[in-house]
Structure formats: C-alpha cells, structure tokens
C-alpha cells in the first residue's frame, strides 16, 4: 500500500534535505526495537520520497509488507503535525491512501496488453552501486536487477533473484531515448552521485515478458528503484504511453 501525506502549503526548502529530515521524523515515531530491526534488513520494507508541487509539499511513504503496515499505518494516520529539527512545525492537511495489492500485480501480469515501449520518470535522485562504485547512468540490467531484488524479497520472500531471468530481460530490452542529468543526493555530509530525468526503453519478445516488465515497473512506483529508497532516493513513476 501507499501512504501519501500532503503537508499544507509549500515548504520553501530543498526536497532532498526534507526527505532525510522526514525519514528521521518517521523513525522517531516508531519503537526503537523495531527501528533496529528495520536497519538490519537487506531490503527495507518501506520507501519514501518528497515531491515539491506548486501549491504543496508531498511526503510520500510506501509501506511494502503487511508487517510494516501493521506497525506504521496507524502511526502515520494519527500524525497531525510534523517537527523537522530547525524548521517550523508543519500541519498535515490530508492523508491520501492508494493500494497496490498482489491481485492487482497478478492482473497486470495476466493482462493481454502488448506494450512494447516503457518510459520511466526519475522523480528524485536515483543511483546504483555496482562492484563497490556509484553508477550515475542507468543500464537496463541495473534497473531490472533492483526491481527483481525488491519484488523477490518483499513480495515473494525470495532472497536471491534468478540470474537467467535477469539475463533474458536485459538482453531483450534496449534504451531508445533518454533525457537525464547528474543530481547529487546529500545524506548528512555525504554527497551521493545520482541522476534524474526520463528514460524510454523497448522490450522485444513474448507478450508474457512485456507483462512481467510492466508488473515490475508498477511495483517499482511503490518500492522505488536503486539505492537508499527509504531516505528518498529512487522515486519513480511510469509515463502513460498510447503506443
């Protein structure tokens, strides 16, 4: 499920800094033992992002497992104001709830829609780590690897992904268009190199393969993509395509 908090008025403050502050605020609302448990997880069962609109600032919290929903949902629902260190207290205008259940993902996978092109909008700085180094330009392999890992661990309870499937997806997908820029995400005193923008790719192969890609990407709108999605990195959305 997705939990979206809409803060009244627009906060004139950098979204990346707000995302880290909001994450700290969220952790303060939870039991310390549960926070320790979350820090030990290989893949965090939640993701957050901050989106600056013209009229308001949205703090979006994605709860990705039943366990964290049980622990966090009511806490989020009861928040009336937010204190972020040195910033003025913020009033919560409304809480919007969107759901993405297993039945919806299965419906996407079983759909007869034969979509070939997919466009990803990277709303917040997105990055990967490969062989110990930061990667500031996406490859189809890194995109699918991240989505498959998050989906496998959080939905299917599978710690490892199928390398053959990853190879097949990567070999049958080609980037056709992109408009990306380097973007740094600051966590405390560390500047993490990343990217933002838009990327379009084509999938060649059976309809089932394309449906699997659509399912992974739809899940990715909730799970985030790449590293540090719990802190606000890797927020993505799919652009609706008519082809």
Language-model segments: residues:
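RNA-interacting cores
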Residues: 1-243
